[in-house]
Amino acid sequence: MDTSPYDFLKLYPWLSRGEADKGTLLDAFPGETFEQSLASDVAMRRAVQDDPAFGHQKLVETFLSEDTPYRELLLFHAPGTGKTCTVVSVAERAKEKGLTRGCIVLARGAALLRNFLHELVFNCGTGGRYIPEGYADMGDQERTRKMRKAVSSYYQFRTYETFAKSVATMSAEAIRARYDRFVIVMDEVHHLRSVQAEGVNTYSAISRFLRTVRGCVKMLLTGTPMTNEPGELADVLNLILPQDKTIRPEDGIFSNSGDLLKPDELAERVRGRVSYLKAARPDAGLTFAGEVLGGTGMTHLRLVRLEMSAFQSDAYASAWDQDAGDRNIFSNSRQCSLAVMPDRRWGSAAEARNPSQVRRMAGQNLAEYSVKYDYLVRVASSSPKTFAYCEYVNGSGLSLLSDILLANGWRRATGRETTPGKRFALLTASQKNIHKIVQRFNHEDNVDGAYISLLLGSRVVAEGLTFKEVRHTVILTPHWNYTETAQAIARSWRAGSHDRLKARGEAVAVTVHRLVAVPRGRDTPRSIDSDMYAVSEVKDKRIKAVERILMTSAADCSLLRSRNLYPSEFDGSRECEYGRCAYRCSNVSVEPGPLPALLGASAAEAVAQVRLDGGGDPAIMKVDMSTLWAEVTAGRRYVNRWGDGAVLRAEGGRLELSAPYGSSEEGRWGDFYKTRNLCYAKMDQDHLRADDLRDSLPQEVEELLTVSPVETIGETASAMPQEVATAILMACVQARADGKTLNVVRRDALLDFYKGFYAMGPSGWTVWLHARGANAKVYDGRRWNPADEDTLEFLAARSAKFTDTRIGYYGLYNPNLKDFCIRDVTQGKRDKVDLRKLTVGRRCVDWDQRTLVHIVARLMKIDGRRDFMPHATLREMRELAEQDPLHEPSDLTSKEACRRFLFWTQKGDNKFRRQDICKAMEKWFIENDLMEDNFDCGHQHKRRGKFA
């Protein structure tokens, strides 16, 4: 039977198939729906199973990878689930595989883009390769500029407004020339319709752009695609739906008022283009204070009811009357429910306040003027870290609250704090250093709010930012839709936001306080807060009904069902779309079993049937089709009825056990196609070189051991395939152990080069080059054996010497590149399943100055020259150290500590370069036996399995 390279493609189901496709590659999953086929994909299931918290990121990366035909996706993932890092994993893979030429990130404002850039550089598994040299010593503007430059070869960042203006005047040819084969990311895409650009319809310009480009991967990011009504979803989906699936008004899917009329039609149109992920389970630490208020019409929202004082109630009644003529704004009532000045002014009139009025409010009777601010101050005073959200800044809003806090003894944070204190930070649109303040708030030394314990945020922080270790979130102002409130809450309840508390063994708990100010007395106006929450709940129920349709029809519905399915105790809750938590995925008739079973019995039974009958019709086999086709595409070997090696192959709509390759391909390329899931188009120079190496390798090994220069023999050996380099090292170790005297000079040169990869163990000479644990080999004087239990304990103890070091860091040395790296193990032993979470070594000169000083001065305690400040007093040295923003309290405890810190942080001509500090650290690691040889040191693409 002839072999086609298509026999070795990794197959994924197409969204739709025509009659002409039946029995061909495009009909690789006959009789199965797209969703049913995808539900059993091994790679995607493995990603979710191995990492329940972040496996969705690997799932989406695989879904949009070079192996699949899928190129657009609405990433409808709840706020705080790590959408940015999901996108980065897709973009980085596309870059590595050559699938795309670049990545353009579009967002509503510069703040969101800066946050995306920061996440890309520091938090999304990019290994530090985008961190600019000298980052720690730069100012804020220079940091942003250098980070943009570091990623500029692949990433571009534009606001919706500026990008729309740019592409609106470009021809289709110009757009394709510049943006074909790009990863296109649209962050918080639900805002696109509301963005205004002078002289340009922003939505139309970007929609045209998306329909013009070719070969692109398109990702729309949102945690809230609908804000006021379900019909808003159409504008979002139409950006990626093909022309024949576009949702038009005349289709009648949504009514003119935005209600969903045809749920089945909506589900059909979005098939294969939505990924849906809920937030962590409601019982995982997020709780809501208060209760459902009676007499409001609300059924689900738990609110904190606060009764206004008689003084505030009287002012509120006047404010309500002033709003009577404009029932759509209620600005007076809303401002008055926040706070009333002692002279009975509120809102814009409160801007004319004087210090004595503020001091009067800030005293013991704050509740007299603001029942909400009094509640917040009491919460913040007893909580390590608190976040308060308020729509209003001026008038009775956050500006007034800031003045009250200052009068109460709080200090305002700047982001440069070096000493503990009772501080708050104000984050508004006028702030230029929001990210600096947030970074200081999130710093590891502020886990318990020692430097900043209270954040006051306006709408500018409602999206994109993460506030870590917050214990209490206080919502001061509701909104007419609940989406705004949910976004604010998500700032302090996000993926990884409380990991440091978990690491300390503490229970993670965030309490949300949604405040409702209610006027005192019977004949008083209604509470505007209560009215707004009631309206938002009604809207939210309509939106959640549509959200459930998207969840059940999502491409990854079955794959993420374990994450999205909440316990039945939450039936009827908002978290379960106000209905039953249990649900079924559309077009998935049978949920695949656990992964081990998926790959086991069912496929084996089908193969046995094919072996017996000589072939079979997949459509009538009692087996999950995706499982069978996974066997086909993997090229897995079986034994046919005659005892010969064979593979499952699709032929004319049947499955057959066939020879791996035809007799005409027995030669050079037969072995190539037996072992690689590739098509001809994917062959590159690396594959050709690898095949050529198979013929030339024996000669190269012979030359290495006979005529190669001794000075470069190690570098030459390390460039060979891993298994060859390992075999050479094992032969050299055995030759020395057996007392061989032939070719001693070259043998010893190789042994010296690889000295960090072998040692005498309890059972004999042990080699672990390119191998760990049970893969290591042991020479007992007669033969090489797998590592036994004693050897495994020996290797584990050797590894523990590095990972359990008292200073939390150890050195790595690449004997080939002569590079020195440092690995951070301060967080202890990591999860050995999720390799992405492992810390790996980074070149010493790439670490920031603050961390290097911390290691060399405080952990290693390397003293400086004896003649450095020999006569200075402790007081004099403390005064100098306190002027340096890098200093910590421990640097001031003794003359020795102070002198060390001042020595390593000298300024001007005496300033130590990173290279100088690294030389001292390298020497210390060697002297303390904490330097490990590792060939990944100095490489961007590290194999994390080596660090597990």
Swiss-Prot record:
A motif (DEAH box) lies at residues 187-190. Its EC number is 3.6.4.-. Keywords: ATP-binding, Helicase, Hydrolase, Nucleotide-binding. ATP binds at H77, A78, P79, G80, T81, G82, K83, T84. PROSITE patterns: HELICASE_ATP_BIND_1 (PS51192), HELICASE_CTER (PS51194). Residues 64-243 form the Helicase ATP-binding domain. This is Putative helicase 009L. It comes from Frog virus 3 (isolate Goorha) (FV-3).
